[in-house]
Amino acid sequence: MKLQVSILFLCISILNARAQISIQKISNNWQFRNVNERIWYSATVPGTVHTDLLQNKLIPDPFYRDNETKLQWISSTEWEYQTYFNVSKNTLQNKTINLVFEGLDTYAEVFLNGKNILYANNMFRTWKIDVKNLIRSKGNHLYIKFFSADRIADSLANIATIKYPSENNRNFIRKAQYHFGWDFAPKLTTCGIWRNIKLEIGDNYHTTKNIQPSWDVELKQTPDSIGQSFYFTEKGKPIFIKGANWVPADVFLPRISKEKYRNLLVAAKQAGINLLRVWGGGIYEADDFYNLCDSLHIMVWQDFMFAGAMYPADKASLENIKQEAIDNIKRLNHHPCIVLWCGNNEIDEAWNNWGWQKQFNLSNQDAVRLWKEYQQIFQERKFQTLSRLTQSLNH
């Protein structure tokens, strides 16, 4: 297979300075509850429902003995979050007031002052909503209802007209795949406001185009008698890669502090690691991770978030995946540490060598369709998106 990658060069306009933009985080006075109960409990944002339940002493430690099994009810339950916030009168005078959700995990319905403003369906996307006509100075009520990812994944699988190879139905939803259990992780399919919510006030941007990378790193793929080469050079000299695989540093992502990122990455640097591969079953990492890799001169091989399964390529799924890619390429592509974008984790390998066709009893017709959908996602859509948002693309 030709590995789908993109060397980091910036072609898009990066929001390098926001002279007239002001930010108001919506992080205080949050509450949450089970939709089947009446009592509200205090919540931490960013956070997850599991960590909020732990903080309120409503569940035992999920990592102790067999508590993982005992706590599976959490992922089949719907959860509500709410807060009230104020804004200044000066804020209300601005022509543009956007409410930005940097990470909602995963299926969520959002209401502001009783108005339905968003239905989120992708953990990896950023959602920006114009709320100029809804916001008021006092007592703004923000309410979010999270739906069961397990139940939605199962319902989507049940109506699919073909079997998509996977050990469960995680491949039907855009959520961190390790949340459904992996060889290193328990099955704790959480939900919640896992990244910041904020108001962006104002709309005057200063942009800088065609920023050049500060690291002169290139991928070399030269045909030879047995295939083609695959190595990196820096300033024209081959690099001996001492790499490692990076998976999320905590099952509950908001618990990963900047200090924890720093400790782990400094340890990797001291061990001689010069490249980390951000694994496709996890997340597009936090800004702190990439900032630290930039400063430590640790290269990053960046997977897109697909791993060990075949994924649906219907129209709605393709559009969702496209927007996910755009959001994350725009957010990350200015980091010199990212030397490679990779389409997925092990799917081509699995299709050709893991016996999926026999294991999942696929007909020849189904196999042809699945491979065509694979190509749509990873060789057509990803190629088009990366080509438009980067200066150079190898695939």
List PLM regions with ranges.
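Accessory beta-strand-rich segments of carbohydrate-active enzymes
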Residues: 26, 33-35, 76-204, 275, ...
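The substrate-binding groove and active-site-proximal loops of carbohydrate-active enzymes
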Residues: 118, 123, 183-186, 245-257, ...
